[in-house]
Design a protein with these regions (language model features):
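A structural signal for short, well-ordered beta-strand segments and their strand-loop junctions
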Residues: 56, 79-84, 132-136
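General structural signal for secondary-structure boundaries
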Residues: 20-27, 31, 43, 92, ...
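Acidic/proline-rich low-complexity IDRs
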Residues: 6, 55, 60-61, 107, ...
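Metal-dependent nuclease catalytic cores that hydrolyze phosphodiester bonds in DNA/RNA
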Residues: 1-75
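Non-catalytic protein-protein interaction segments used by genome-maintenance enzymes to assemble
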Residues: 61-117
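Metal-dependent nuclease catalytic regions and adjoining charged, substrate-binding loops involved
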Residues: 112, 122-215
Length: 215
């Protein structure tokens, strides 16, 4: 019943209209995949937290990392230390269906999955170094990563990642201290409008380009 409720809510979603129908096509495909993704996510989460006395949902962790002026902020999905990552089919013109099935990573060494390790390192740094877990779920299967089966989630690796996070934060702090205005701050960084983070409505992009003097 819970799955049907979520499926009904997703059917009511109104796809965006400014991306040549890409969002609408994904919406239809994901209506098919959603029940299986939910089932695999539930199975993975039950297995990952089988020894827990209770299950805690998303919380905000906001605390200082040594040597920084501003706090680190992160939001673990479950029990202060775990996160769920869902994987979905992606458009592929070469496939007969028009979509390529989602692939669950076999390790966390890839560029995109390493970003999730950085996220887990933030949990670990702020929750008393509790061992993190990541659950990946798709329409076909699921995979659980823990310190027991993944070197990237072990304490020594996470400690190194936290040091990298601190370097990134320190650079951001230096920029904030050097800039007296928003315009000065934006002038210190170069935007990459091909990056997925800029997948925004045309009006939003037009304003951003205007601010950077590109329009």
């Amino acid at each position: 019943q819970a799955i049907e409720e979520q499926l009904s809510r997703y059917r009511d979603y109104k796809p965006r209209e400014w991306d040549d129908g890409s969002d609408a096509a994904r919406h239809q495909k994901y209506i098919e995949e959603l029940p299986a993704v939910i089932e695999h996510a539930l199975a993975g989460l039950r297995e990952a937290m089988a020894r827990e006395n209770r299950i805690l949902g998303e919380i905000e962790l906001l605390d200082m990392l040594p040597g920084l002026a501003l706090p680190h902020n992160t939001r673990p999905d479950y029990n202060r230390r775990g996160d769920l990552k869902t994987k979905w089919s992606s458009p592929d013109r070469r496939a007969k269906s028009g979509f390529k099935a989602a692939a669950i990573p076999k390790s966390l060494t890839g560029m995109f999955d390493m970003k999730n390790v950085f996220q887990a390192a933030g949990f670990w740094a702020l929750n008393g170094r509790q061992p993190p877990f990541l659950v990946y779920a798709s329409a076909s299967n699921y995979q659980i990563f823990t310190p027991e089966n993944c070197d990237e989630l072990k304490d020594d690796f996470l400690a190194d990642v936290v040091e990298e996070i601190k370097v990134q934060h320190r650079c951001t702090e230096n920029l904030l201290q050097a800039a007296e205005t928003k315009e000065q701050l934006l002038g210190m960084v170069a935007p990459d409008f091909k990056n997925i983070i800029w997948n925004e409505p045309p009006g939003y992009l037009a304003e951003a380009k205007r601010v950077w003097g590109l329009a």
